[in-house]
């Protein structure tokens, strides 16, 4: 054992050449424009669900938000406007698959279900598994610890109903 102070640099003793740069975690891939639009739509729906502010004002505020320039504006507008406009219809579509009332859902879960339901019904160019995965990721990012599992289960059942041929072909 050496009396030399430990500098924390193990160098060659740790299997790394002396002077090697410390390993850093790889950067996460950049978010897609559609993912950003979903995140912003979820945030707008969250605001709208909590206080029913004018959706036009919420939309304008989010258009000015930092990072909006990297979002798919058309997809954002379709998601936010469509989910609000069709809230009753979309809720009626996923409500049979809930094990609690809609009012008992967290606002994040409810917003994610609205985004996912809207995409399942209207965005047929997006595979249903992508729609579900994106809603799950939104819930993991913004929701409670286990909420994503619930959103996954509800949207999976809804997909089997509204996209039956696509789901059957994948199973």
UniProtKB/Swiss-Prot annotation:
Protein name listed in UniProt: Transcription antitermination protein NusB
- A Pfam family annotated for this UniProt entry: NusB
Q: Which GO terms describe its molecular function?
A: RNA binding
Q: Name one GO biological process term.
A: transcription antitermination
Give the taxonomic lineage as stored in the record.
Answer: Bacteria, Pseudomonadati, Pseudomonadota, Betaproteobacteria, Burkholderiales
Q: Which domain of life is it from?
A: Bacteria
Function noted in UniProt: Involved in transcription antitermination. Required for transcription of ribosomal RNA (rRNA) genes. Binds specifically to the boxA antiterminator sequence of the ribosomal RNA (rrn) operons.
- Which family, according to the similarity comment? Belongs to the NusB family.
Q: Which UniProt keywords apply?
A: RNA-binding, Transcription, Transcription antitermination, Transcription regulation
What do the Gene Ontology cellular component annotations say? cytosol
Q: Does the keyword Transcription regulation apply?
A: yes
Matching entries from HAMAP family are given as: NusB (MF_00073)
Q: Segment Disordered: which positions? A: 1-36
């Amino acid at each position: 054992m050496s009396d030399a102070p430990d500098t924390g640099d193990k160098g060659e003793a740790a299997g790394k050449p002396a002077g090697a740069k410390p390993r850093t975690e790889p950067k996460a891939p950049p978010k897609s424009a559609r993912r950003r639009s979903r995140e912003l739509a979820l945030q707008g729906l969250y605001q709208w669900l909590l206080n029913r502010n004018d959706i036009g004002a919420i939309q304008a505020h989010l258009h000015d938000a930092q990072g909006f320039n990297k979002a798919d504006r058309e997809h954002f507008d379709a998601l936010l406007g469509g989910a609000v406009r069709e809230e009753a219809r979309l809720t009626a579509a996923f409500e049979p698959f809930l094990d609690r009332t809609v009012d008992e859902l967290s606002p994040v879960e409810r917003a994610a279900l609205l985004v996912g339901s809207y995409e399942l019904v209207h965005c047929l160019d997006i595979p249903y598994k992508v729609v579900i995965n994106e809603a799950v990721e939104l819930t993991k990012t913004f929701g409670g610890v286990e909420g994503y599992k619930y959103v996954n289960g509800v949207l999976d059942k809804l997909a089997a109903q509204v996209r039956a041929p696509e789901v059957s072909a994948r199973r």
